[in-house]
Protein backbone atom coordinates (compact mmCIF):
# COMPACT_ATOMS: atom_id res chain seq x y z
CA UNK A 1 0.00 0.00 0.00
CA UNK A 2 1.79 3.19 -1.17
CA UNK A 3 0.05 5.74 1.08
CA UNK A 4 1.66 5.97 4.56
CA UNK A 5 -1.52 7.42 6.07
CA UNK A 6 -3.43 4.34 4.93
CA UNK A 7 -0.75 2.04 6.38
CA UNK A 8 -1.01 3.87 9.68
CA UNK A 9 -4.79 3.38 9.72
CA UNK A 10 -4.48 -0.34 8.97
CA UNK A 11 -1.97 -0.98 11.76
CA UNK A 12 -3.92 1.13 14.24
CA UNK A 13 -7.18 -0.71 13.49
CA UNK A 14 -5.52 -4.12 13.70
CA UNK A 15 -5.97 -4.90 10.00
CA UNK A 16 -2.19 -5.18 9.56
CA UNK A 17 0.41 -6.72 11.85
CA UNK A 18 3.49 -4.78 10.64
CA UNK A 19 3.73 -1.32 9.08
CA UNK A 20 6.92 -0.01 7.47
CA UNK A 21 8.00 3.27 5.87
CA UNK A 22 5.68 5.52 7.82
CA UNK A 23 6.47 9.23 7.90
CA UNK A 24 7.59 11.08 11.01
CA UNK A 25 4.09 12.44 11.59
CA UNK A 26 2.51 8.98 11.36
CA UNK A 27 5.09 7.53 13.75
CA UNK A 28 4.55 10.36 16.23
CA UNK A 29 0.78 9.85 16.08
CA UNK A 30 1.15 6.14 16.91
CA UNK A 31 3.57 6.54 19.83
CA UNK A 32 1.86 5.35 23.00
CA UNK A 33 -1.32 4.23 21.25
CA UNK A 34 -2.93 1.05 22.66
CA UNK A 35 -2.43 -2.11 20.65
CA UNK A 36 0.72 -1.03 18.83
CA UNK A 37 4.39 -0.54 19.58
CA UNK A 38 7.05 1.40 17.68
CA UNK A 39 10.43 -0.25 17.13
CA UNK A 40 13.42 2.00 16.38
CA UNK A 41 16.27 0.03 14.85
CA UNK A 42 19.55 1.60 13.66
CA UNK A 43 19.86 1.62 9.88
CA UNK A 44 23.06 1.85 7.84
CA UNK A 45 21.58 4.82 5.97
CA UNK A 46 23.60 8.04 6.37
CA UNK A 47 23.08 11.60 5.15
CA UNK A 48 26.11 13.75 4.43
CA UNK A 49 27.18 17.02 2.85
CA UNK A 50 29.86 16.78 0.16
CA UNK A 51 31.90 19.58 -1.39
CA UNK A 52 33.00 19.06 -4.99
CA UNK A 53 36.67 20.01 -4.79
CA UNK A 54 37.00 19.49 -8.53
CA UNK A 55 34.54 22.27 -9.44
CA UNK A 56 36.80 25.15 -10.45
CA UNK A 57 33.86 27.57 -10.71
CA UNK A 58 34.16 28.04 -6.95
CA UNK A 59 37.77 27.74 -5.69
CA UNK A 60 36.54 27.89 -2.09
CA UNK A 61 35.27 24.32 -2.37
CA UNK A 62 38.78 22.86 -2.20
CA UNK A 63 39.79 24.92 0.85
CA UNK A 64 40.09 22.70 3.96
CA UNK A 65 39.17 25.68 6.13
CA UNK A 66 35.69 25.68 4.59
CA UNK A 67 35.34 21.96 5.28
CA UNK A 68 36.41 22.46 8.89
CA UNK A 69 34.11 25.43 9.43
CA UNK A 70 31.21 23.54 7.87
CA UNK A 71 31.46 20.84 10.54
CA UNK A 72 30.68 23.51 13.14
CA UNK A 73 27.84 25.09 11.16
CA UNK A 74 25.45 22.14 11.10
CA UNK A 75 22.71 22.17 13.73
CA UNK A 76 22.93 18.43 14.27
CA UNK A 77 20.54 18.26 17.23
CA UNK A 78 18.02 20.58 15.62
CA UNK A 79 17.98 18.46 12.47
CA UNK A 80 17.70 15.05 14.11
CA UNK A 81 15.52 15.81 17.13
CA UNK A 82 13.31 18.71 16.06
CA UNK A 83 13.02 18.54 12.27
CA UNK A 84 13.34 14.81 11.62
CA UNK A 85 11.61 13.91 14.90
CA UNK A 86 13.97 11.18 16.01
CA UNK A 87 13.94 9.20 12.77
CA UNK A 88 17.67 9.90 12.56
CA UNK A 89 20.40 10.33 15.17
CA UNK A 90 23.62 12.32 15.08
CA UNK A 91 26.53 10.34 13.67
CA UNK A 92 29.69 11.95 12.33
CA UNK A 93 31.88 9.29 10.72
CA UNK A 94 31.70 7.30 7.51
CA UNK A 95 31.04 3.90 9.11
CA UNK A 96 27.52 3.57 10.54
CA UNK A 97 26.97 2.54 14.13
CA UNK A 98 26.47 -1.22 14.15
CA UNK A 99 29.14 -1.92 11.57
CA UNK A 100 32.35 -3.31 13.13
CA UNK A 101 34.97 -0.59 13.47
CA UNK A 102 32.56 2.34 13.50
CA UNK A 103 33.46 5.33 15.64
CA UNK A 104 30.68 6.40 17.96
CA UNK A 105 32.18 9.74 18.92
CA UNK A 106 30.54 12.93 17.70
CA UNK A 107 33.20 15.64 18.09
CA UNK A 108 31.29 18.45 16.34
CA UNK A 109 28.37 20.61 17.42
CA UNK A 110 26.69 23.77 16.16
CA UNK A 111 29.12 26.58 17.02
CA UNK A 112 28.94 29.49 14.53
CA UNK A 113 31.44 31.56 16.51
CA UNK A 114 34.05 28.81 16.17
CA UNK A 115 33.30 28.50 12.47
CA UNK A 116 33.67 32.25 11.96
CA UNK A 117 37.07 32.13 13.68
CA UNK A 118 38.22 29.29 11.41
CA UNK A 119 37.17 31.20 8.29
CA UNK A 120 38.72 34.44 9.52
CA UNK A 121 42.03 32.74 10.28
CA UNK A 122 42.06 31.37 6.72
CA UNK A 123 41.28 34.81 5.29
CA UNK A 124 37.96 33.65 3.86
CA UNK A 125 35.35 36.36 3.34
CA UNK A 126 31.96 36.29 1.64
CA UNK A 127 31.89 32.50 1.65
CA UNK A 128 29.16 31.03 -0.51
CA UNK A 129 28.26 27.94 -2.52
CA UNK A 130 25.32 26.32 -4.26
CA UNK A 131 23.82 23.17 -2.79
CA UNK A 132 22.14 20.51 -4.91
CA UNK A 133 19.44 18.70 -2.98
CA UNK A 134 16.52 16.38 -3.66
CA UNK A 135 13.26 18.25 -3.21
CA UNK A 136 11.82 15.84 -0.65
CA UNK A 137 12.37 14.95 3.02
CA UNK A 138 14.72 14.36 4.67
CA UNK A 139 17.10 15.95 2.16
CA UNK A 140 15.36 19.30 1.64
CA UNK A 141 14.73 19.48 5.38
CA UNK A 142 18.43 19.10 6.10
CA UNK A 143 19.37 21.56 3.36
CA UNK A 144 17.00 24.27 4.59
CA UNK A 145 18.35 23.87 8.11
CA UNK A 146 21.90 24.21 6.78
CA UNK A 147 20.99 27.30 4.80
CA UNK A 148 19.84 28.96 8.02
CA UNK A 149 22.62 27.70 10.30
CA UNK A 150 25.47 28.38 7.85
CA UNK A 151 24.19 31.95 7.48
CA UNK A 152 24.85 32.44 11.20
CA UNK A 153 28.50 31.67 10.48
CA UNK A 154 28.66 34.06 7.54
CA UNK A 155 28.35 31.40 4.82
CA UNK A 156 25.67 31.84 2.16
CA UNK A 157 24.07 28.75 0.65
CA UNK A 158 21.95 28.93 -2.50
CA UNK A 159 19.72 25.87 -2.65
CA UNK A 160 19.19 24.07 -5.96
CA UNK A 161 16.27 21.73 -5.22
CA UNK A 162 15.37 19.20 -7.91
CA UNK A 163 14.04 15.71 -8.46
CA UNK A 164 16.28 12.91 -7.26
CA UNK A 165 17.15 11.84 -10.80
CA UNK A 166 18.32 15.35 -11.65
CA UNK A 167 20.48 15.66 -8.54
CA UNK A 168 21.94 12.23 -9.19
CA UNK A 169 22.75 13.17 -12.79
CA UNK A 170 24.43 16.44 -11.81
CA UNK A 171 26.56 14.75 -9.16
CA UNK A 172 27.54 11.94 -11.54
CA UNK A 173 28.53 14.59 -14.10
CA UNK A 174 30.49 16.43 -11.37
CA UNK A 175 28.54 19.63 -12.06
CA UNK A 176 27.60 20.32 -8.43
CA UNK A 177 29.37 22.64 -6.03
CA UNK A 178 28.01 20.85 -2.98
CA UNK A 179 25.28 18.28 -2.45
CA UNK A 180 23.30 16.56 0.28
CA UNK A 181 23.55 12.86 -0.40
CA UNK A 182 22.45 9.55 1.06
CA UNK A 183 24.76 6.58 1.48
CA UNK A 184 23.98 2.95 2.30
CA UNK A 185 26.70 0.25 2.22
CA UNK A 186 26.59 -2.12 -0.71
CA UNK A 187 27.56 -5.00 1.60
CA UNK A 188 28.09 -5.54 5.31
CA UNK A 189 31.77 -4.70 5.61
CA UNK A 190 33.73 -1.54 6.40
CA UNK A 191 35.43 -1.64 3.01
CA UNK A 192 32.15 -0.78 1.29
CA UNK A 193 32.16 2.68 2.87
CA UNK A 194 35.92 3.17 3.09
CA UNK A 195 36.36 2.47 -0.61
CA UNK A 196 33.60 4.98 -1.37
CA UNK A 197 34.68 7.93 0.75
CA UNK A 198 38.46 7.53 1.02
CA UNK A 199 39.50 5.84 -2.23
CA UNK A 200 39.91 7.56 -5.58
CA UNK A 201 42.11 5.98 -8.23
CA UNK A 202 40.97 8.49 -10.84
CA UNK A 203 39.11 5.81 -12.78
CA UNK A 204 36.09 4.71 -10.76
CA UNK A 205 33.07 6.76 -9.66
CA UNK A 206 33.53 6.54 -5.91
CA UNK A 207 32.15 9.31 -3.71
CA UNK A 208 35.70 10.67 -3.46
CA UNK A 209 36.05 10.53 -7.23
CA UNK A 210 32.75 12.31 -7.88
CA UNK A 211 33.89 15.10 -5.57
CA UNK A 212 37.38 15.45 -7.02
CA UNK A 213 39.16 14.41 -3.83
CA UNK A 214 42.25 12.24 -4.15
CA UNK A 215 44.71 11.53 -1.34
CA UNK A 216 47.32 8.88 -2.27
CA UNK A 217 47.96 8.02 1.40
CA UNK A 218 44.27 7.26 1.91
CA UNK A 219 44.21 5.11 -1.22
CA UNK A 220 47.04 3.06 0.28
CA UNK A 221 45.33 2.93 3.67
CA UNK A 222 42.09 1.70 2.09
CA UNK A 223 43.84 -1.14 0.27
CA UNK A 224 45.90 -2.02 3.34
CA UNK A 225 42.82 -2.22 5.56
CA UNK A 226 40.84 -4.52 3.27
CA UNK A 227 43.86 -6.84 2.94
CA UNK A 228 44.71 -6.94 6.67
CA UNK A 229 44.20 -10.53 7.91
CA UNK A 230 44.21 -9.69 11.63
CA UNK A 231 40.67 -8.67 12.60
CA UNK A 232 41.66 -6.40 15.49
CA UNK A 233 44.33 -4.62 13.46
CA UNK A 234 41.88 -4.21 10.58
CA UNK A 235 39.31 -2.50 12.80
CA UNK A 236 42.07 -0.24 14.11
CA UNK A 237 42.97 0.81 10.57
CA UNK A 238 39.36 1.75 9.84
CA UNK A 239 39.16 3.78 13.03
CA UNK A 240 42.28 5.69 11.97
CA UNK A 241 40.75 6.38 8.56
CA UNK A 242 37.54 7.67 10.11
CA UNK A 243 39.50 9.98 12.41
CA UNK A 244 41.45 11.31 9.43
CA UNK A 245 38.28 12.06 7.47
CA UNK A 246 36.78 13.75 10.52
CA UNK A 247 39.93 15.87 10.76
CA UNK A 248 40.10 16.91 7.12
CA UNK A 249 37.88 15.86 4.23
CA UNK A 250 35.27 17.50 1.97
CA UNK A 251 32.47 15.62 3.76
CA UNK A 252 30.29 16.54 6.70
CA UNK A 253 28.58 13.44 8.05
CA UNK A 254 25.30 14.59 9.58
CA UNK A 255 23.21 11.68 10.77
CA UNK A 256 22.35 8.02 10.63
CA UNK A 257 18.88 6.67 10.07
CA UNK A 258 16.62 4.60 12.24
CA UNK A 259 14.31 2.06 10.69
CA UNK A 260 11.06 2.68 12.52
CA UNK A 261 8.65 -0.23 12.34
CA UNK A 262 5.20 -0.31 13.90
CA UNK A 263 3.91 -3.72 14.99
CA UNK A 264 0.81 -4.88 16.79
CA UNK A 265 1.58 -5.63 20.41
CA UNK A 266 0.85 -9.33 19.92
CA UNK A 267 3.60 -9.66 17.30
CA UNK A 268 6.72 -11.32 18.71
CA UNK A 269 10.24 -11.90 17.42
CA UNK A 270 10.55 -9.18 14.76
CA UNK A 271 14.24 -8.63 14.05
CA UNK A 272 16.00 -6.40 11.55
CA UNK A 273 19.64 -5.62 10.91
CA UNK A 274 21.38 -2.52 9.58
CA UNK A 275 20.47 -3.05 5.94
CA UNK A 276 16.95 -3.25 4.55
CA UNK A 277 17.48 -6.82 3.35
CA UNK A 278 18.43 -8.02 6.84
CA UNK A 279 14.91 -8.96 7.99
CA UNK A 280 14.02 -12.42 9.29
CA UNK A 281 10.27 -12.96 9.04
CA UNK A 282 10.65 -16.67 9.83
CA UNK A 283 11.22 -15.67 13.46
CA UNK A 284 8.02 -13.64 13.73
CA UNK A 285 4.99 -15.04 15.52
CA UNK A 286 1.73 -13.81 17.01
Name the predicted role of every residue range.
Residues 1-3, 20-21, 40, 131-133, ...:
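Short beta-strand-to-loop elements that line the ligand-binding cleft
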Residues 22-33, 185-190:
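A ligand-binding cleft/hinge motif common to bilobed small-molecule-binding domains
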Residues 81, 121-138, 175, 179-185, ...:
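Bilobed periplasmic-binding protein-like "clamshell/Venus-flytrap" ligand-binding domains
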Residues 1-29, 156:
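Ligand-site clamp/hinge motif
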Residues 7-8, 16, 26-27, 66-67, ...:
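Short, hydrophobic alpha-helical packing/hinge segments within bilobed ligand-binding/sensory domains
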Residues 148-202, 237:
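Periplasmic binding protein-like
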Residues 29-41, 48-63, 97-114, 120-124, ...:
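Short, solvent-exposed loop/beta-turn-alpha elements that line the ligand-binding surface or hinge
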Residues 39, 61-148, 152-153, 212-214, ...:
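Append "and occasionally in soluble cytosolic enzymes with long acidic Gly/Pro-rich linkers
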